[in-house]
Swiss-Prot record:
Its EC number is 2.4.1.325. Keywords: Cell inner membrane, Cell membrane, Glycosyltransferase, Membrane, Transferase. It catalyses: beta-D-ManNAcA-(1->4)-alpha-D-GlcNAc-di-trans,octa-cis-undecaprenyl diphosphate + dTDP-4-acetamido-4,6-dideoxy-alpha-D-galactose = alpha-D-FucNAc4-(1->4)-beta-D-ManNAcA-(1->4)-D-GlcNAc-undecaprenyl diphosphate + dTDP + H(+). Disulfide bonds: none annotated. It is a peripheral membrane protein. This is TDP-N-acetylfucosamine:lipid II N-acetylfucosaminyltransferase. The gene is wecF. GO terms for biological process: enterobacterial common antigen biosynthetic process; fucosylation. Its main location: membrane.
Length: 361
């Protein structure tokens, strides 16, 4: 009998908790236990099994310990299969490259960042080369439409399927009409976290150039931890450009309901990372009728256009009239049909897990 183990190979609490909650609360209610139950998770602080009673979770204190556990299982039982949720664990890539883990044992759901190559040092260039070679040996790849297109340029022979991250969304909010006030300054959300990939300072300068100082800017930087120096730089630039009255930097992570309430107040999002990132925040903005600016280098634009959603590209001319027109277009879309919204992404997960178990879909 095939055993399927889900692997969260890096200690990224906010994403890992979302996946575990989705499997425990949603998939466990409708799919066979053997498809959803077994998890190995990298977590220095541990995970309470009482929070996820439908799952059997083995925690490892770090990436290396987790990789060793996965490799040992893979070598002991070649019928065992592993579903990698994201993959930021170099030891696992090397194990796949060396044959310690076989291609047919690995199913990989891409989380965006693990496809892209941003660092330029010699050490990273060597790692990226090895990772590219390993990524060609995956048995089956799941990703967004844009990430699949990017991946297939380098690994055209690997089977692929469309699959979306299980964004935490309340479907009851999808059909709600959110009226945007036309009077007063626009409110612009910059970035989805404190990660430098958001290029916050560049975004702030671009917003100031396009709209002037009379817009309200919100910058959420509640994670990652130990980011005080960069936060201070962004805060200094933001205050200099927009002043205390119009610039708000959020240094603590908001509770989910508070985050939703904050998003509802926005007129525009500004996300100029050069990769697929922040789909959760983008989904919530779409749900509330808020258009956003993205980079042309972010392949998620392909998913947006496939769903007939307006796309505003970074670097193009932009003013308030164009923002209001994008809001109008977004309001006219039947959001219940959007493929990457809850519950529409559920069928992709049903098919993916059946495939990983070798069952018909």
């Amino acid at each position: 009998m095939t055993t399927l183990i889900h692997v969260l190979g890096s200690d990224i609490p906010h994403h890992n908790q979302t996946v575990l909650r989705f499997f425990n609360d949603v998939l466990a209610t409708e799919l066979p236990e053997q498809q959803i139950r077994h998890f190995i998770v990298a977590s220095r602080d541990g995970i309470s099994s009482a929070d996820f009673p439908a799952l059997r979770i083995e925690t490892c204190v770090d990436k290396k310990t987790l990789a060793e556990a996965v490799i040992a299982r893979a070598k002991a039982n070649r019928n065992m299969r592993f579903f990698l949720h994201g993959q930021f664990n170099p030891t696992l890539w090397l194990a796949l490259l060396s044959g310690k883990i076989k291609s047919e044992q690995v199913y990989w759901h891409v989380w965006g960042a693990d496809l892209y190559e941003e660092a330029s040092s010699l050490k990273y260039r060597l790692f990226y080369w090895l990772r590219r070679m390993a990524q060609k040996r995956v048995g089956h790849v799941f990703a967004t439409r844009g990430d699949l297109a990017w991946y297939q340029q380098r690994a055209p022979r690997v089977p692929t399927s469309l699959l979306y991250f299980p964004t935490r969304m309340n479907p009851a909010l999808t059909g709600m009409q959110v009226d945007k006030p036309l009077a007063g300054p626009m409110t612009i959300l910059v970035g989805n976290s404190g990660d430098r990939t958001n290029r916050h300072q560049e975004a702030l300068r671009a917003i100031h150039k396009q709209f002037g100082k009379n817009v309200r800017v919100i910058v959420p930087m509640g994670y990652p931890a130990n980011n005080e120096s960069y936060i201070a730089q962004v805060e200094g630039d933001g205050l200099a450009l927009f002043g205390v009255k119009n610039f708000q930097l959020l240094k603590d992570q908001l509770a989910f309901d508070d985050y939703l309430n904050m998003l509802r107040t926005c007129d525009l999002g500004y996300f100029i990372f050069d990769r697929q990132q922040g789909i959760g925040t983008l989904c919530l903005l779409i749900q509330f009728g808020v258009p956003f600016v993205i980079s042309r280098q972010n392949p998620f634009w392909q998913d947006l256009t496939e769903q007939n959603l307006p796309v505003l590209f970074y670097g193009d001319e932009l003013d308030e009239a164009l923002v209001r027109e994008a809001q109008r277009q977004l309001a006219s879309v039947d959001k219940h049909q959007i493929a990457f919204f809850n519950p529409n992404y559920l069928q992709g997960w049903r098919d993916a897990l059946a495939l990983a178990m070798g069952e018909p879909t």
